[in-house]
Swiss-Prot record:
Name this protein carries in UniProt: Glutaminyl-peptide cyclotransferase
Localization per Swiss-Prot or TrEMBL: Secreted
Binding site for Zn(2+): D144, E184, H322
Entry annotation: catalytic residues: E183 (proton acceptor), D238 (proton acceptor)
CDD domains: M28_QC_like
Pfam families for this protein: Peptidase_M28
Any GO BP annotation: peptidyl-pyroglutamic acid biosynthetic process, using glutaminyl-peptide cyclotransferase
Organism, as annotated: Ixodes scapularis (Black-legged tick)
Length: 353
């Protein structure tokens, strides 16, 4: 993601943040019924056992290594993602290609895992798995984006039974996980030196033609001409793992979806299920406010092709962003655990698990 944009956000955020309740955005109709989770289901999603914590931490350790494009560790991380999702009986595709970079031709591979490839519509959760080539030393990128990668795999594992049941319903909706390669610039962020994987995949899916007649249970009035059109919404996770992040709704079109995250966090707080320090009574990660989405990230190539976007990235960025301090020691595990609860409930609610 682009650093000058962060500076711009800090300068104008006071002028641009708008109370969502003052807008008509929350009255927009989403094409799907976003019914709140039943209370007992919310309580279930808000419980994380010690076994779950151990599973998540074990998963995370596989990502807490330098993951520079073209390196051995980068390849091992990709293989771990593929193996983990194949073990859960997901359909896994590797979108591999060679790309021109300031450091010459480099190999890239996006990983796309789809629970039910026949389903017409897709709830897409995404992150990037590569790490920055840092000039000053070994960069781990714990928030950027080891934690988001581990969270996606954790969601697939922890919800596996419910997801497999949903897969057999034939309701035309499925979960898709996308792990982008080559998000980071090799030298200086530009339209050519960044977002290698997402630019390639967006173009590929735009050119991959299909139709509603060939797919399972498309919604009425759905206009499906290519794979891009099957993306009902992309939820992009980035820079997660620092204490007390602050998120905003960056796109009016997806305000109804973003508000589900606000609501879920509030309900989990009401139920006493969030992990809090003694001095705090509630978390307040998901602001009930909107701001203009200036940040450049892997969603941009899809946004340009009219894919609805929810961008879960903190503003401001974590203090450790693009420094060698973005490592395991500076992660805040209670915050990560709280976000895992929110994401589990969100996926369960959206897919009506």
């Amino acid at each position: 993601m682009l650093f000058p944009v962060l500076l711009l956000l800090k300068l104008v955020i006071g002028a641009l943040i708008i109370d969502a309740s003052a807008l008509s955005w929350h009255d927009l109709k989403w094409p799907r019924d976003l019914r709140p989770l039943a209370h007992h289901d919310l309580l279930y999603m808000g419980q994380i056992s010690e076994e779950d914590r151990g599973d998540f931490n074990a998963t995370l350790r596989n990502f807490l290594v330098p993951r520079v494009v073209g390196s051995q560790k980068h390849r091992e991380v990709r293989e771990f993602i593929v193996r983990s999702l194949k073990d859960l009986d997901w359909d896994v595709e590797e979108d591999c290609f060679d790309g021109q970079t300031p450091h010459g031709i480099k190999p890239f591979c996006n990983v796309i895992a789809t629970l039910n490839p026949s389903a017409c519509h897709r709830l897409v959760l995404a992150c990037h798995y590569d790490s920055l080539l840092h000039k000053e030393g070994t960069f781990i990128g714990a928030t950027d984006s080891a934690v988001p990668c581990a969270q996606l795999l954790y969601l697939a594992r922890s919800l596996n039974g419910k997801l497999q049941n949903q897969k057999t319903r034939g309701d035309g909706l499925t979960l898709q996980l996308v792990f982008f390669d080559g998000e980071e610039a090799f030298e200086r962020w530009s339209s050519h030196d960044s977002l290698y994987g997402s630019r390639h995949l967006a173009q590929k899916w735009h050119e991959d033609r299909t139709s509603a007649e060939r797919l399972e249970s498309c919604l009425e009035r759905s206009e499906i001409a290519n794979q891009i059109d099957r993306m009902e919404v992309m939820v992009l996770l980035d820079l997660l793992g620092a204490e007390n992040p602050r998120f905003y709704s960056y796109f009016g079109e997806t305000q109804p979806v973003y508000r589900r995250l606000v609501n879920i966090e509030s309900r989990l707080n009401d139920a006493g299920l969030m992990e809090l320090p003694r001095r705090r009574r509630r978390t307040n990660y998901f602001s009930n406010s909107s701001t203009v989405g200036f940040i450049e990230d892997d969603h941009i190539p899809f946004l340009k092709r009219s894919v609805p976007i929810v961008h879960i990235i903190p503003s401001p960025f974590p203090d450790v962003w693009h420094t060698l301090d973005d490592n395991e020691q500076n992660l805040h595990h209670p915050t990560i655990s709280n976000l895992n609860k929110i994401f589990k409930a969100f996926v369960s609610e959206y897919l009506q698990l």
